[in-house]
Amino acid sequence: SFTVPNYVVVSADSVVPGSTKGESGFIANITQISTEQTGKESLHNNKVANAEKQLNGEFIDPDLEEPWMNEADFDAEEGWSYYPVWVEWVNQNQDAPNPVGNFSANNGYEDEYIPNIPGWYDSTDGIAGEYLALLQLDEGAYTLGVNSDDGFRATIGVNYNDVLAQEIGVFDGGRGASDSIFDILITKAGLYPFRVLWFEGGGGANIEIFSVVDGEKILINDPDVDGAIKAFIPKGATVDEQIMERDATTGRAAVVSITPASGQKRVESASSIEVVIEN
């Protein structure tokens, strides 16, 4: 007997033109709201929905009636901002180079620090970030994985802000460094917009993004491994400087919000439905 993996069939409509491809690598967009501002270890409480809320700058300081400061932007003074960073691959750990996860100095992959962490107040807690890339994928089946402390959500969609993007992997909660493995099926070769939301409440913090080939774990975009999945940042995206709004885009129109939100409770039957589409 044999077991057929439970593949997510990725929509071929997500493929973007080759003209969107920038340099090799990922964009790491890290945010932090720690106990030094709020008195709480984290505001997102290790939940996907709240991590998205933090990343969007939607947690409000009740005294100033403005968003809390992003401690992972060293140029921040007040309010919400971002400081996206280019990385070649994703093998990060708050205690680098101490070994955590599958890839470490023990097997030739010394852990790297999480960009801009510790933040303003020297904390390593209350983090929510995203890792963005265009993955070059051929037709066929792929096994992907994320090793994380704490949780994550991986998606493929027409654009990075696409709320209708396909979820291909998720761990919605807190945990120590652990693997989540998931399978996808590609029916059309091309560049696919890939996003991993990652978050950490307190204690340890790490993330690795990889594929699995014949039982071997391979970092996505490892230039030293033949056949490693290649990743590229979208052309024109800002890196290594402060921005007030995230600008990584594929140029494709996407649904960026739906009101009422999925799962929202106590919605009046007469309430209107609002869908916002942005290019």
Model-predicted segments: where are they?
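N-terminal non-catalytic regions of secreted/periplasmic and cell-surface proteins
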Residues: 2-7, 248-279
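Acidic/polar, compositionally biased interaction segments
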Residues: 5-250
